[in-house]
């Protein structure tokens, strides 16, 4: 008897792989079927005749196998196979493959991905602004990464910083305390916070929950809220605070192609884009401004058709964009700010600080925590060893829902935290032992629903 190999799924006239394949097939996740092949595959599992095996050709032995040759997918970490180098495993990333040396595709790609730093321009120093009270702005959550960024910009570079906080209903107590302590510790920072009305937020969250099985809208909804503020204050730079593991995770999740990491430095492409702007009598864009407009327009008007056709759509952002449509009035100020800034050229440049470089070569989580505790009064979450995503009470719920959707092949999106903790352990952001401890104690990779899901539903069901 034959069947479709584990982690392959028939969708229309293609077989799609849900997992992370070995090099060089890492992103070769679809196989197109002929009509005859599709007819045969649709009736699996069953015995196959010699003629049917001949029609299936090279699929047999790869995507189509004898029933006893199907790979077993573990149902817990205890049964998982782990990478020899990092902590990637075939439970938290079902369908991940390993080479003959026991390395996962993330570790197989170390040399190929070493220069993939950011999909927006990298800047580690900034000039003083001549047109604004603020040199830079950041979105501040009270978490580890945004606190370190705020410390670096205000205390190390001694810049005037605008810190913008979206008060989500799930903000952790430790994050709230960290924000208050930062206000007392960082004298060159001005803090602004905003809260979406419960009526609007529940409309958005209910739609997002229907699409994604969680309500995580960060940071997209914060962009919607605060872009008009950035334009009104003529802030020259909006600085992102994503740590290296998060940025590289986009590549392995097939959300950002290699070219996306080189585009920020492509003067030729920006030149061509500016030629088009010249015909509409608009000022040329400077470094990082294209990325700002592209991001804000995506949120205001929806995803790029070209990007979707190329197969690099971001399911998470797409779902957030769809959910925001449930409260359309929230987009009006954003759309006005986009039009005004595009006409005037007063566009805050979207840039990223290289956390590895500014922290001495490796963004070591424990050392970073020590710095921000000392300099900013940062308060660690209850699970004090936790290093990933430290500001939200329902982070585990997001991890659980992303994991469950991927495990059961309802989504092609690999759980973000699964990739990030694996990349971080490979890149010496934390030791393999510490990463393993965080994986087992602090992350939401469970086939059973976890308590944090009740916290999420409690808000949207009121």
Where in the sequence are the language-model features?
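Acidic, low-complexity/disordered tracts enriched in E/D and polar residues
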Residues: 1-42, 77-80
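Short, exposed beta-strand/loop patches in secreted or surface proteins that constitute
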Residues: 6-10, 56, 96
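Hydrophobic residues embedded in beta-strands of well-ordered beta-sheets
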Residues: 13-15, 64-65, 104
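Short acidic, hydrophobic short linear motifs in intrinsically disordered regions
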Residues: 36-56
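A short, conserved structural fragment
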Residues: 52-76
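Nucleotide-activated chemistry modules centered on ATP-dependent adenylation/adenylyltransferase
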Residues: 78-101, 105-136, 152, 156-462
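Short, glycine-rich nucleotide/cofactor-binding loops
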Residues: 136-145
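Hydrophobic positions on the alpha1 helix immediately C-terminal to the Walker A/P-loop
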Residues: 148-149
């Amino acid at each position: 008897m034959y069947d479709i190999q584990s982690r392959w799924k028939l969708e229309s006239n293609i077989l799609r792989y849900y997992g992370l394949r070995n090099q060089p097939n890492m992103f070769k996740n679809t196989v197109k079927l002929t009509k005859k092949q599709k007819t045969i595959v649709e009736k699996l599992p069953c015995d196959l005749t010699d003629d049917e095996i001949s029609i299936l050709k090279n699929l047999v032995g790869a995507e189509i196998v004898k029933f006893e040759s199907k790979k077993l997918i573990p149902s817990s970490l205890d049964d998982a196979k782990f990478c020899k180098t990092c902590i990637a495993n075939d439970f938290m990333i079902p369908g991940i493959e390993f080479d003959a040396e026991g390395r996962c595709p993330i570790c197989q790609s170390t040399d190929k991905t070493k220069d993939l730093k950011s999909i927006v321009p990298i800047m580690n120093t900034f000039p003083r602004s001549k047109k604004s009270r603020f040199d830079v702005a950041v979105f501040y959550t009270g978490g580890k990464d945004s606190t370190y960024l705020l410390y670096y910009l205000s205390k190390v570079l001694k810049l005037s910083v605008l810190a913008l906080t979206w008060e989500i209903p799930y903000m952790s107590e430790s994050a709230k305390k960290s924000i208050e302590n930062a206000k007392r510790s960082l004298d060159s920072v001005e803090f602004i916070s905003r809260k979406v009305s419960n009526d609007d937020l529940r409309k958005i969250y209910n739609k997002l929950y229907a699409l994604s099985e969680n309500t995580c809208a960060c940071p997209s909804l914060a962009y919607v809220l605060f872009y008009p503020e950035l334009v009104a204050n003529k802030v020259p730079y909006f600085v992102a605070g994503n740590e290296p593991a998060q940025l590289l995770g986009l590549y392995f999740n097939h959300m950002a192609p290699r070219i996306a990491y080189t585009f920020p430095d492509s003067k030729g492409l920006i030149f061509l884009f500016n030629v088009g702007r010249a015909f509409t009598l608009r000022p040329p864009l400077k470094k990082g401004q294209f990325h700002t407009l592209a991001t804000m327009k995506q949120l205001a008007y929806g995803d790029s058709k070209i990007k979707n056709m190329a197969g690099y759509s971001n399911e998470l952002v797409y779902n957030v964009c769809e959910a925001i449509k449930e409260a359309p009035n929230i987009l009006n100020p954003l759309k006005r700010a986009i039009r005004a800034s595009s006409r005037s050229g007063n566009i805050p440049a979207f840039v990223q600080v290289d956390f590895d470089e500014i922290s001495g070569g490796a963004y070591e989580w424990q050392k970073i925590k020590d710095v921000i505790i000392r300099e900013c009064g940062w308060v660690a979450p209850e699970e004090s060893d936790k290093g990933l995503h430290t500001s939200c009470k329902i982070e585990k719920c997001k991890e659980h829902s992303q994991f469950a959707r991927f495990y059961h092949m309802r989504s092609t999106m690999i759980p973000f935290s699964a990739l990030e903790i694996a990349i971080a352990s490979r890149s010496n952001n934390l030791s393999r032992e510490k990463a393993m401890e965080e994986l087992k104690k602090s992350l939401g990779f469970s086939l059973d629903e976890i308590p944090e899901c009740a916290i999420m539903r409690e808000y949207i069901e009121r």
